[in-house]
Swiss-Prot record:
Belongs to the mimivirus R1 family. This is Uncharacterized protein R9. It comes from Acanthamoeba polyphaga mimivirus (APMV). The lineage of its organism: Viruses, Varidnaviria, Bamfordvirae, Nucleocytoviricota, Megaviricetes.
Length: 376
């Protein structure tokens, strides 16, 4: 194959643009000398920072233009140009996250590798987080028996995440490893127990994430896992605010946060009745229910007037929303009080979810219901 038919990815700049931290990316069919000749007329002080022949040159250019859109300089027509405004070490880190191989590099002008490594680590963490969220919700389509039969110890998670394509077996291995990481599973060798756990919890990944965030587990974790678990869809703060408001109204408190080990309350029938009506009358959620329903994947419905006839609707709605955070608001036993019989109500975290997350964050040594999956 003639050299002029080979596609290269390149980065160029000039002394002026380099001082402004501005670099042009692009692809080129031909030699390095051809590229220099092409630009020397316009830029006598041309600097070639990077030049590499690669079969994915077009894909790299497309991905960088997309991922770095907000850093692209606006041209005189108001469109986004191929000039990128950012530190070169950071741009280089983006490039190396796209091109895993150093093969066929002709020019690679980078000096501060320590800074490059720092940026690369940050980018890989973010990429890992996105990959988990793109992959983890595909797990439900897998048969648990297939995942249970995969020996994940034969694979390296970081390597699988950086691969452009995966075989079916490696894809299953990746999904299993991400599933195990999400829940903190340390041992999957007991296949029957893994299948049982998978069937019960594969659909509760969102609940696990919300529980971790709301009860501040992820703030005490290491940097990488904090980034993985803290992926935010832009609406989490609003959801959290609604949940906090519900709990405060139910308990008659005004707290800014709760811990999972202290949220355990018993309410009398009268306290329960007052709590539900207070939530219905004063909470931001019910003040604009049509607006907030989609936050919790609830379909739109007709507004129900706040009165004793619609009490059940409000209670069940509050129950469902709290349950989406791993918090149970339940009716308990009927007790005799002042000559009559009344129900007790409890507000507490889901014990099994709390046990799983406590183990994941090193706060306990086992999970009673699944001892073969969770042990030190």
């Amino acid at each position: 194959m003639k050299s002029k038919q080979i596609i290269a990815f390149y980065v160029i700049t000039t002394n002026y643009h380099h001082n402004k931290k501005t670099y042009k990316i692009g692809i080129h069919t031909g030699t390095l000398e051809d590229l220099i000749s092409r630009y020397m007329t316009y830029f006598p002080d041309l600097i070639v920072k990077y030049f590499q022949y690669t079969v994915i040159a077009r894909e790299v250019e497309t991905n960088l233009k997309k991922n770095l859109r907000k850093h692209r300089v606006v041209n005189i027509k108001g469109g986004r140009s191929e000039w990128i405004n950012m530190e070169y070490e950071k741009l280089y880190a983006h490039i190396k996250c796209e091109i895993n191989s150093d093969k066929n590099i002709i020019i690679n002008d980078v000096t501060n590798m320590e800074l490059v490594n720092k940026y690369t680590k940050e980018l890989l963490i973010n990429k890992l987080s996105r990959t988990i969220y793109q992959t983890i919700f595909d797990i439900e389509i897998c048969k648990p028996e297939l995942l249970a039969g995969i020996d994940e110890s034969k694979y390296n998670l970081d390597e699988l995440l950086t691969k452009q394509t995966l075989s079916e077996t490696k894809s299953l291995a990746l999904k299993k490893m991400l599933f195990m990481k999400t829940f903190g599973i340390t041992d999957s060798s007991h296949q029957e127990e893994f299948i049982e756990f998978y069937n019960e919890y594969a659909s509760k990944i969102v609940i696990i994430r919300r529980f971790e965030r709301f009860f501040s587990y992820d703030k005490q974790y290491n940097e990488i896992d904090y980034n993985l678990n803290h992926h935010n869809d832009g609406k989490d703060k609003l959801r959290d605010k609604i949940i906090l408001e519900f709990i405060n109204f139910i308990l008659g408190k005004n707290k800014t946060n709760y811990k999972s080990d202290s949220l355990s309350y018993i309410l009398s029938q009268d306290e329960h009745n007052t709590a539900v009506l207070t939530v219905a009358e004063q909470s931001m959620y019910f003040a604009n229910e049509d607006k907030f329903r989609p936050l919790f994947n609830k379909n739109k419905g007709k507004f129900k007037e706040i009165n004793e006839f619609n009490f059940k609707h409000y209670f069940e709605t509050v129950q469902a929303i709290l349950r989406s955070y791993g918090i149970d608001y339940c009716r308990g036993k009927r007790k005799r009080i002042n000559g009559g019989r009344e129900f007790e109500y409890s507000l507490s975290v889901n014990k099994q979810i709390r046990d799983i997350i406590d183990f994941k964050y090193g706060l306990s040594d086992s999970v009673n219901d699944f001892p073969n999956l969770f042990h030190k």
